[in-house]
Amino acid sequence: MILPINTYSDEVLRRKAKPLKESDAQLEELISNMLESMRNAEGIGLAAPQVGVSLRLIVVDLSLAEGYEAASPMVVINPHILSVKSFNSMEEGCLSIPDVRGDVVRPSAIQLKYRDRNFEECIGEFDRLAARVIQHEIDHLDGTLFVDRMQRRDRRKIQKELDALSRGEINTNYPVAFHEDSVVK
């Protein structure tokens, strides 16, 4: 089922998400719905708060990105970054902030502890685009948006677009939820 994606001014995007304690049929359904919703919106990452569910869960599928066509979807539960290496700046966008892009400085490689779709504990090394997308989605779990990480002068350049999003002026090819009609669990 395709879920609506919560947008910029929605309070669920500003909350710290709760850790998951176990896997169950509801979690599996949420994961499947998130993957379907992300693909429908032509995204490469989606966090549970973006679909109105305040849990520490993200899905990533880089197969739509150039050079990553063979990538498999990844489910990340209760992520914790153990270490980072070097930093670089790259333009980012977000399904919750449609048609807005901006440069963000992030570590270019991370070591991550997390649980997978089967709730097995994993430690993985990620770099380049995978590291960036995972960090972007983890930010959602902590109530941070990519625009919060932009330099002040760059953020001022997109303020009109952010104000329009706050007023509900959104044009997307995927369903969205506004703060008046979102559901937080």
UniProtKB/Swiss-Prot annotation:
Gene3D superfamilies for this protein: Peptide deformylase
CC cofactor: Fe(2+)
Textual note on the cofactor: Binds 1 Fe(2+) ion.
Keyword field contains Iron: yes
Family annotation (Pfam families): Pep_deformylase
Active site: E137
CDD domains: Pep_deformylase
Keyword Repeat among record annotations: no
GO molecular function: metal ion binding; peptide deformylase activity
The protein's Enzyme Commission number: 3.5.1.88
UniProt-listed SUPFAM superfamilies: Peptide deformylase
Function (record text): Removes the formyl group from the N-terminal Met of newly synthesized proteins. Requires at least a dipeptide for an efficient rate of reaction. N-terminal L-methionine is a prerequisite for activity but the enzyme has broad specificity at other positions.
UniProt record similarity statement: Belongs to the polypeptide deformylase family.
Name of this protein: Peptide deformylase
Source species of the chain: Chlorobium phaeobacteroides (strain BS1)
Phylogenetic classification of the source organism: Bacteria, Pseudomonadati, Chlorobiota, Chlorobiia, Chlorobiales
Designated gene of the protein: def
